[in-house]
Amino acid sequence: MALIVEFICELPNGVHARPASHVETLCNTFSSQIEWHNLRTDRKGNAKSALALIGTDTLAGDNCQLLISGADEQEAHQRLSQWLRDEFPHCDAPLAEVKSDELEPLPVSLTNLNPQIIRARTVCSGSAGGILTPISSLDLNALGNLPAAKGVDAEQSALENGLTLVLKNIEFRLLDSDGATSAILEAHRSLAGDTSLREHLLAGVSAGLSCAEAIVASANHFCEEFSRSSSSYLQERALDVRDVCFQLLQQIYGEQRFPAPGKLTQPAICMADELTPSQFLELDKNHLKGLLLKSGGTTSHTVILARSFNIPTLVGVDIDALTPWQQQTIYIDGNAGAIVVEPGEAVARYYQQEARVQDALREQQRVWLTQQARTADGIRIEIAANIAHSVEAQAAFGNGAEGVGLFRTEMLYMDRTSAPGESELYNIFCQALESANGRSIIVRTMDIGGDKPVDYLNIPAEANPFLGYRAVRIYEEYASLFTTQLRSILRASAHGSLKIMIPMISSMEEILWVKEKLAEAKQQLRNEHIPFDEKIQLGIMLEVPSVMFIIDQCCEEIDFFSIGSNDLTQYLLAVDRDNAKVTRHYNSLNPAFLRALDYAVQAVHRQGKWIGLCGELGAKGSVLPLLVGLGLDELSMSAPSIPAAKARMAQLDSRECRKLLNQAMACRTSLEVEHLLAQFRMTQQDAPLVTAECITLESDWRSKEEVLKGMTDNLLLAGRCRYPRKLEADLWAREAVFSTGLGFSFAIPHSKSEHIEQSTISVARLQAPVRWGDDEAQFIIMLTLNKHAAGDQHMRIFSRLARRIMHEEFRNALVNAASADAIASLLQHELEL
């Protein structure tokens, strides 16, 4: 008669691959037959087989037995009883959670390929491959053998003619440009016509220098002035001076005498110490695949242009370290801040797959570029863009923006030695309106001071700048600055739909003062016979909690509100979001914050006014159902987020979203809200676990890395996962614990992850087997279940799969299935889904 060991499974994740291997290893040290019996399921399995153990569907809390019979049953009984009591409960540690505080590492599917990497700082994301092509930086001092002077009169005449030609050439290029290109050419036109530059050039030739010598001397003079500035913005303008001066050399002496460096004839990743905007514009964009710069910041005109053309760009690059790979194929990875040199075939295939996925995503999103945002039940909610400069407007509207919900004008005041004048601001707003083509732009007046210091205003540093002297609170002291901005906005309003929005309003006194100044600015323009929109709308940021309690009074004086969710969160919850010690308290899913939002939206709508939201919260897809439930009139977000937001909104029913919001406001903790949202995502679409679009047949993937990357990419394209690399990392974490190869050329990679939107069983049938741990696999069934899924669904499905795969008939049916639909149907039937 068999000896019996009775025990309860205390493993939090049940018996999966790792603990099963421990049981299997220990049981195989005995000759006796040992059977595992799960009393809950009444399933039995050979304890010397990990696959059979998994098939018993043993979960946490299950009552189980080991039945032992054979020559050494006494010894086995004693040893296994002790092990099950003392060691078994501790043989499966939970997987460590990945923290996102630090820079995320490279994807595991890439690092496993052992690529040779050089890191740099990303200023424009994306990835591409091409020939590493050096571009000579524009060093006027290295030109050498400058032409000699032919007399003062001749040089002055040549200089005057050259300056005229430069201006005409820039104006000609402006006729065929728009967006960022237009704005930067305008900056160059301003430089070429600059009085100080002209005077310095003329002084040089009057002193006997040739035009070339005077141009180089003038460039050095102004570049030295800029380089002494503590402002990175001004330092980067030195490149524009050299650019315009080189254009002047070319106009006077010809391009043969001073040829522009860099002509592209093949797909290229260009590298340079620095690149002028004109050099960038001259590069053939059909061949330019990436840009590597030794110097250049986020405000560099070249970097701004690269962004507008969606060229992956890295700065801070060690150019000398790249010299050995000139004229060789490399890859730029702007998503990871990496340059990959000497790529082997596997690395090349990795980036080819990246390119295919990005092309597919762009094709998916194309339909949303021109469609208005609506919920599934037809409720209209405008999706607008946040921008900080007119150069961003064209790309935003091209990405599907229905308006600009936030034009942050403070960026126009920062990193310079003096405030922009009325004409400069007017031109910037007009450029943005040109791209808008009749669509609305909400201009937020300068939110400077406090945490956004401007040197020339001499606002002293503060202990708590978020609560200090900033935004509307500085306007009275700097009234002329505020009036200048109001005048520029009003003048531009004659050319399109502009609205004015005031930041940091906390009282009626501030609103009334602003309206007084706005009325004065309007009267000035009337007296000067300058046209503007007499009915221009005035709104305020709803970011200081006190405003929520005077909404009725505010509505008597203003036209609209826009919720600044970032600041409102920190003010309402008393959290400095830049203080790492209290960051965990900064959570816009706090039920108190959600209640505050709902109160504000309903109060505004009762007064018949418009209210939008322009904080970071608007771009979070997971929170979108709550924002729809609030009944907001508009959501404003970063431009790249717009197509996906429209697509997600089209799947939401506003009535269901309202019910969800009510449930969220009834929660007691942020964690409960997160769990509620996760459950809503899983049930909203009622998406089946198995679907043909997540099944690929005869895949050409040649390694485990390609399989996991490809299958998670498919989940992204199917709309079931927004962060495929994070989901992939969770799968690799499981693989690091124990390989999920099951034998029979089958593997079942699996994970419970917060990065899967809809729990999914994916399938890949490969053309040829790939190495999977110590075995090979050709048929992959990937199980990805949402971390917040209720119950033990993950282990139940895994257990059923393991049991079925032990049967040859089931394996053959999967391997020989004629279509993805046939595989989906078979899995649904066999797994009782």
From Swiss-Prot:
Annotated family: Belongs to the PEP-utilizing enzyme family.
Catalytic residue positions: H16 (tele-phosphohistidine intermediate), H301 (tele-phosphohistidine intermediate), C614 (proton donor), H750 (tele-phosphohistidine intermediate)
PROSITE patterns: PEP_ENZYMES_2 (PS00742), PEP_ENZYMES_PHOS_SITE (PS00370), PTS_EIIA_TYPE_2 (PS51094), PTS_HPR_DOM (PS51350), PTS_HPR_HIS (PS00369)
Written domain comment of the UniProt record: The PTS EIIA type-2 domain is phosphorylated by phospho-HPr on a histidyl residue. Then, it transfers the phosphoryl group to the PTS EIIB type-2 domain.
GO molecular function terms noted in the UniProt entry: kinase activity; metal ion binding; phosphoenolpyruvate-protein phosphotransferase activity
Domain annotation HPr: ranges: 2-91
Keyword Metal-binding: yes
Compartments where located: Cytoplasm
Ligand binding (phosphoenolpyruvate): R408, R444, N566, D567, R577
Catalyses which reaction(s): L-histidyl-[protein] + phosphoenolpyruvate = N(pros)-phospho-L-histidyl-[protein] + pyruvate; D-fructose(out) + N(pros)-phospho-L-histidyl-[protein] = D-fructose 1-phosphate(in) + L-histidyl-[protein]
Keyword set, alphabetical order: Cytoplasm, Kinase, Magnesium, Metal-binding, Phosphoprotein, Phosphotransferase system, Sugar transport, Transferase, Transport
Region annotation (PTS EI) ranges: 143-653
Top-rank taxon, per record: Bacteria
Residues where Phosphohistidine is found: H16, H301, H750
EC number(s) on file: 2.7.3.9, 2.7.1.202
Amino acids binding Mg(2+): E543, D567
Cofactor: Mg(2+)
Keyword Metal-binding applies: yes
Protein name, as recorded: Multiphosphoryl transfer protein 2
Any GO CC annotation of this UniProt entry: cytoplasm
Coiled-coil ranges from the UniProt annotation: none
Principal EC category: transferase
Pfam families in UniProt: PEP-utilisers_N, PEP-utilizers, PEP-utilizers_C, PTS-HPr, PTS_EIIA_2
Start and end residues of each PTS EIIA type-2 domain: 688-830
